[in-house]
Amino acid sequence: MLNKIINREDLSYEESYDLFNDLLNESEIKIGAYLSALQTKGFTANEIAGFAKAMRDNAIAIDLGKGISDTCGTGGDGYSTINISTAVSIILSCFTKVAKHGNVSITSKSGSANVLDALNIKKDCNPEEAKKMIDKTNFVFLFAPNYHPALKKIMPVRKELGIKTIFNILGPLANPANPDYQIMGVNSLDLVEKVGDALKLLGVKKALVVYGNGLDELNPNDYSTICEINENEENKIYKIHPKDIGLTPSNPIPCNSPDESAKRIIKIFSGTINEDRDFILLNAAAALYASNIAKDYKEGLKLAKEVIDNGTVLKKLKEIQKYGE
């Protein structure tokens, strides 16, 4: 199969699934060769989905029920902003169950796991604890290294290679809770359609894949490109601007640490009105739409504003924090 990839021939979904399983038992040299060859060829939706399904199937089993949402993005956009996906996941948990799958930061100064630590939110739940936490609070964080022990052999090779590989985009697609709804940020335009097609193959009910013209979130100051996935429908690609849903464009404020990110999220949840609020609201509106809570982005914005302004989301944050004490 390595020669096939080197010859720039695409793998089928089934071949990709089998290759992932084979890599778990290969030598480090072979793993490095396959990952490098795939990266050079460029991967397809079938290859992404095949790897992601195999990664899910090799994960620690967890059953959190149906109707779960996730807000994980690829990261790696090179910008240091507050952790939008974490803030959005807490807002979303005011309406539905959220199992946020994530890891410590690779390029950002405030990755999800880092910010959850700063917020004093429990992040090391085993499957039994995760079920109890999500049933009690509507929120749980699934720390990726705890749920993907099969990757222990592959991770050092990725680090040694020092290049981007298919694994850079697999994390958000490999949530072991198999979410029905998802908003997923990607860090390049060419991934929007591919990842959308991969999510369709993975059987998601509804999802949005977003690229914010340089950001792996919806951009608060520019157009964002979106792939909308609905089961039993063709995927749709379109652009959206903050003004389209009634927000004034604003530049995201840089963030220097997880602690700063946590403090700024709490400020917004406490009623502070500034650029951070608009950035969070824009992405929360999309998440509520992606999770079938809101009928469109404008209704999503209205709902997100309401739970911030009436104190519901701050109360939810305290409830989630208290659970881990």
From Swiss-Prot:
Query: Which residues does anthranilate 1 bind?
Result: G73, N103
Q: Which family does it belong to?
A: Belongs to the anthranilate phosphoribosyltransferase family.
Cite the record's note on assembly. Homodimer.
A single cellular component GO annotation: cytosol
**Gene name linked to the record:** trpD
What name does UniProt use for this protein? Anthranilate phosphoribosyltransferase
Q: Which residues bind anthranilate 2?
A: R158
Where does this protein come from, organism-wise? Methanococcus aeolicus (strain ATCC BAA-1280 / DSM 17508 / OCM 812 / Nankai-3)
Highest taxon, organism lineage: Archaea
Q: What does this protein do?
A: Catalyzes the transfer of the phosphoribosyl group of 5-phosphorylribose-1-pyrophosphate (PRPP) to anthranilate to yield N-(5'-phosphoribosyl)-anthranilate (PRA).
